[in-house]
Amino acid sequence: MCTTLFLLSTLAMLWRRRFANRVQPEPSGADGAVVGSRSERDLQSSGRKEEPLK
């Protein structure tokens, strides 16, 4: 009984490791250029630094 439980838990862990780490590629632009992530574009487009709240 314990051996079966150990075997099933090991298989479940290996199965999750194999299939849980799928990374979806971001859609590129129409001209094939690589587009940065949304947070990078937001930081570049703002051009100013945030002032700390007092």
From Swiss-Prot:
One of its GO terms (cellular component) is Golgi apparatus. The keyword Lipoprotein applies. One of its GO terms (molecular function) is opsin binding. InterPro entries: PRCD (IPR027937). Palmitoylated at Cys-2. Palmitoylation is essential for protein stability and trafficking to the photoreceptor outer segment, but does not appear to be essential for membrane localization. Probably palmitoylated by ZDHHC3. Residues 24-54 are annotated as: Disordered. A lipid is attached at C2 (S-palmitoyl cysteine). Its main location: other. It comes from the Eukaryota. It is a lipid-anchor. Expressed in retina. GO terms for biological process: visual perception. Keywords: Cell projection, Disease variant, Endoplasmic reticulum, Golgi apparatus, Lipoprotein, Membrane, Palmitate, Retinitis pigmentosa, Sensory transduction, Vision. Pfam families: Rod_cone_degen. Belongs to the PRCD family. Interacts with RHO/rhodopsin; the interaction promotes PRCD stability. Involved in vision. It is linked to Defects in PRCD are the cause of progressive rod-cone degeneration (PRCD). PRCD is the most widespread hereditary retinal disease leading to blindness in dogs and phenotypically is the canine counterpart of retinitis pigmentosa in humans. This is Photoreceptor disk component PRCD. It comes from Canis lupus familiaris (Dog). The gene is PRCD.
